[in-house]
Amino acid sequence: VIKVAVLPQGSVSDEAVRHLLRGLEYELVYYKLITDVCLSTANGDTDYCVVPIENTIEGSVSAHLDFMIHDMDLPIQAEWVFPPTQNLIGFPDTDLAAVEKVLSHQVAIAQCREYLKANLSHAEKEVVSSTVEGVKQVQREGNPNWVAVGTQLAADIHGLTVLAKDIGDHENNMTRFLLVGPKELNGKRSEHLKTSILITLPEDYPGALHQVLSAFAWRRINLSRIESRPTRKQLGNYYFYIDIEDSMDSVLLRGALKEIEAIGCELRVLGSYPSFNYSEV
């Protein structure tokens, strides 16, 4: 049985990892904060951790990416996408016109901006640590004038009612998750393989980023993402996080990475792993 660290029971992460691990024997260990989720695996208390890393609407979850870069030294073992369905949750007798406060995670609030503007513009929006925490606070308070944005699973667990289903602004909203841990995930295979790397450019080397991209371009290696993040060492110093549509088994990719190191770049491979779409899992 594999032990997997994840954000609280009823969160989108909880729904997403259940989807990925269908058919496998696993135990979920819940933590309130993403830092604790990651550290449990880094410390050996769990085999894997689940990290939400990107969303169709909001883009990169930079804080999670930074934590993986600076505070963990474990490889990515899989990625998958999952559609987060956000709902308005409260008590059966809640009157939307009387709602005073909406509680949820900042990403969930952002994903439902248009609905909240049209239906609850009068209510205060309070950001909490997770969608589940918002649901818990509404349940604890017992006030019908408080509502939360969260999953059906969270509403069921905490005995609340879904007042409005699927209130997200975009139908094609997807969240990308990473499974991070020391060992390869057995029992799941995908034809689609990816590699993630971190590059630090050499100082005083004009055109270094162009050289890096050229190493991939002339080999016809596709990059699906490139993002700069601060190194935290000096103002203006950045890492480049790059997702590559290829496996480390590829001779072409290994050649590209050697070329990049030859121009003086520091290189760290964050993982070479299977990538699953929603229907493939």
Please name every model-derived segment.
Residues 1-281:
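Domain-level signature for soluble enzymes in the chorismate/prephenate branch of the shikimate pathway
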